Amino acid sequence: MRWALLALAIPGASQSALADAPRLGPFELPKPRELTVFRNDEAFNPYEALNGSFTSPETCAAVPDGLWVEAEGKGDCIRYYPQALADGGNPTVLVYFGGDVMLRNAKGVRFITDSYIRQSPATIGAEMAEWAKKAGHPVIFMARPGIYGSSGNHNNRRHTREIALMDGALDQIRQKYNISSFILTGHSAGGQIVASLMNRRKDVSAAVITSGLVSVKQVSAFWERRRKIPGKLLYNAAEFYDPITEIERISTDPRPDIYVISDPEGRVVPFFSQLFYVRRLRAAGFEPHHIYAQATDRQRHLLAYHGRLAAALIAQGRSEVEIRRAVHEMDLEQFK
């Protein structure tokens, strides 16, 4: 039951917005402002998540666990939330990438989920501390551009630059903490980040993707046909980075251990797109483990804690059978 209650705190758990929360019309341009440095229990601001933020290397130096990362000729301050990292060296570190916090309604209006507004550095720190204790290894929450204290524009998600910023941040973190390998975990659009980083890096020993946006253009086409305003009028999906197109770039020496966890009844990221990714991995000679799970939210989407559990067990050296059993036991516990 405890895991089920924790799942309610995951950003994206609610697809509603507070009545007085800011919104952007389908064709309205965002109005970015100077990055706010959130500390302790200060709740993240929906305005910056919706409109974006900017800062300088000098200001970034004062951001707790902030990294100045440059990509495509522009820099952003990328914030991360570490737990249990040692000074001398860290053989294996678990890293989590969350999903989107900005949603669109049927008319294309953008808003920030109310669950995001309830989050703060303190709540993230508490979740990471618990994950580190469960795994017995250091962990990190990576704040994607424009959200959770990182500068940037969350409207520009899915693009290559977002991937490059996350890649550059991991490079700096690896060097700073003397990390040998990463176990990457990504939920929903965070799954796109993880799949994309596997295409770029050779230090990913394992990856866990839950309800993952891993076939980006396929899913974009699916949703474009279901909005009142065609998606192609709101964004150019051809510019999105689709990790499924470069699966052959995943390292084969060493070969990462890949887990994909899906709810076949998922209504946010269609199950068929995740199945397609798994089949493409197998066709390329990889051996992904595809686990079916049951999310308890109305959209049958929230499997982030299933993914964190699987990653913790991978870090402990558990077998595939043990991991599958633990994920299914979590399913059963949710309904007690």
Positions of predicted regions on the chain:
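Gly/Ala-rich beta-loop-alpha elbow adjacent to hydrolase catalytic centers
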Residues: T185-V194
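Short, surface-exposed "cap/lid" segments of acyl-processing enzymes
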Residues: G73-H137
